[in-house]
Amino acid sequence: MRQARGNIDWQRGWLLLPLLLISLIWSSTADASWDQSLYRQLGLAGKLDKQTFRQALNSYQTVRHKRKPILTIIDYSKPSTQRRLFVIDMKRHKLLYHTWVSHGRNSGELAAKHFSNQLNSRQSSLGVYRTAETYLGKHGYSLRLDGLSPGKNSNARKRAIVVHGAAYANPTHLRKYDKLGRSWGCPALPKEQARAIIDTIKGGSVIYAHG
């Protein structure tokens, strides 16, 4: 009797396996379809690589204690001559900002090729951040960041890696020098846009820096 019951359970398990596989495939397909739909809705074709966008979405979804449905993507794989910062409203599915951003002095000239989590490296850091509080410092209105990627950006606070505005991060500097100026590792924004962007993303939104 026990053997017969065991055989029945074993057979049921095999019958359920295809259903489980179908469910997993459907879930994966649905996620990919949603990613592609949002990518099109935001008008990111030709501006941001699909795979980079998907990685940013995955990172956004894994961050705990988000307090704002805002995702900022920094694509350091692009040169500083291109607008490589994207601020996305994940609730309204809207691209709020698409603008320039500087990288660290020791990360490279035109493009960022070297990244570090070390103090005094003056390099940009990759990975996932959660935005924190604002303050007034030597660069004016600025935004502190907490690095959530161990070994990649976990020293962001100690390194004073913050979002701030800079005159060297705007199109005028770009036209004059054919590249943006560089920071000491901070994602520096065009001065005229910095306050508005900081106010949009401050207080618990997610930043994904790709390179």
Positions of PLM-derived features:
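N-terminal cationic amphipathic segment used for targeting or macromolecule association
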Residues: R2, S28-A30
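Cleavable N-terminal signal peptides
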Residues: L19-L20, A30
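Low-complexity, Gly/Ser/Thr/Pro-rich intrinsically disordered linker/tail segments
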Residues: Y208-G211
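N-terminal signal peptide c-region/cleavage motif recognized by signal peptidases
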Residues: S23-S27
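Cell wall/extracellular polymer interaction/catalysis modules
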Residues: A30-W184, K191-S205
